[in-house]
């Protein structure tokens, strides 16, 4: 028997010191201690009561109101179920395991649990127990009859062994999934589902969909047991959160989830193109994934990349297509496992909260897929094939997983969801490049060949060809035609048959011709073998190199010939001295070395060009972002400036002129952001100017000579014009651009920025437009444009006749 707490006290221990309580004592036996122990027990009771109160408060906030389901869904989308102790119940509501009517919860959950018990009893059987009730001719271990329990038992054993093999690899970093009872639950649920769905059976990856469900149920059960230690929970809680039915509830939730995910695991092919005409007229330049029958998951990931990604980021879409990274490489795992391997388990549960809360058909998966690509888009665009593959197959850790959900919601419906904060990702690209290289090396092991082996094979083929040709050229003293191939038949036929009396005179010529024929017959197979060798090498390079940049550049190399051309020489003529066979061997040997060196140089050049292209793509992406930002800022500024100008003109203000002048300056900034005005870089170098001023020749795109003539012409015109005071400064007048000539006819302030009707000086006086000293000289129109501009002083650079819209790149020589 266990001794009391007072009897187990150490003799040297003081009475005021706290004493540990034996955990095997019941709550009633704990009250038998001394006063200090009673005080400690009361404190623990208060703590447990506080825990139960917070537990009940969370239950009431989630489920005790009329519109509770909408509240729970919103919390799931907003990521507020991360620390919830009722996440499993929320998932049951999202997956329609529990009805919306709370009065039917208990009856529905009991029905589902009884359903799983019957399924388990049917499919998980022991043939030894039913041996006495069956015919032994059919029911025996050696029977192959379909109705034999032993035959079914061995088939089930094979299926269970395949499931157990995957279950052992489920979340190996977590101790929870290494427990035998948890593994048994995983195996039984997956086995029962496979037997209930014979058309699908079990597919690899299903265990990673079931594991988070079991983990969530286990956490909620532990929280329930902890909260029920201090108080008595309701019968509804006891029924829904009973730990004895963890396996039953997991099967019900997993079955509902697979109602949507079943097509993603199905291997049945569906051919969208049927009919005889499709076979006769195939699609030209179609990708391999677009031809022939495909499974549903392949169609889904192709649509995500070809439509969603192309819509939201055309640059990233083109980059992945240029690298030939098909979405099946990484997308199959992303979608099938609901991103189970891309995030840590706690972050994964938050993602599943949003996916389940959004809709039962999991339509948010497509946009989470796209948001994940956009999160690492800068790293992908600036990387080559290996690094991109490493990033996609080993997705980096995200600091705030909820920002990814907000991005996905914004991509789907930007009107209802605000734009999330811009997040930057700066990974260690060397790490992902190494991971991508490992993946590529595994796939290239059988495809890559050594260059030395290629040369050895080609040389052996050449020597073998020479042995076959050498017997044909042996009879050199005969006067008949020398047998040869088709290319030399015309040449041999041109030699007439000589008599024995003419033999001494033509003996030397015949020997020379026979040597030439032999050399020609030896060199022609050598050229053919070298060309065949280069073609094989290019094919191996095309198989081994996955980047299309390398393919396009590798095919432009020219064929190198190691021997002089003989096909162009006419038959019957005396040839110049051809190289002997030994020289030909040396030339072929050194040409092979030269080809290997040129190949290494070509590969080095390709790598440098790839890096340059990656940098150009990255810079082009930044330029596109800046361009979009400037246009957006110009659009918003235009809208607000029009509103401010309308209000100012309607009110009689004391300093109205100064406000209008400031508005004109802001319109100049708007035009610079929009690209209507050229921005001179020298304005920043001249000093810290408080105001952006535009010179008279600001809109001239010609050289410095023409630009220097415009201010002088402006000064002369201003001095000759009557009624204009000579004490004005360039700051007295602000040139306001107008958007379009047709805006005057539509009336003032019709939704876009309009020019001011008068040019106002800083002194507050209004001046007539004829007194403006600002003249516009078009260098393309000649001097006449200077005088013509005086009649239309309000012309602005926004007119299409004088400039082009958008940004222009100004070289330092033009400034």
UniProtKB/Swiss-Prot annotation:
Keywords noted in UniProt: Autophagy, Cytoplasmic vesicle, Endosome, GTPase activation, Membrane, Methylation, Phosphoprotein, Protein transport, Transport
The protein here is known as TBC1 domain family member 5
| Comment, domains | The arginine and glutamine fingers are critical for the GTPase-activating mechanism, they pull out Rab's 'switch 2' glutamine and insert in Rab's active site.
Q: One GO cellular component from the entry?
A: endosome membrane
- Which Pfam families did the record assign? RabGAP-TBC
List the molecular function annotations (GO) for this entry: GTPase activator activity
Q: Where is this region: Required for interaction with retromer?
A: 56-64
Positions with biased composition (Low complexity) = 483-492, 510-539, 556-568, 783-796
What is the protein's species of origin? Mus musculus (Mouse)
Annotated motif LIR 2, positions: 805-809
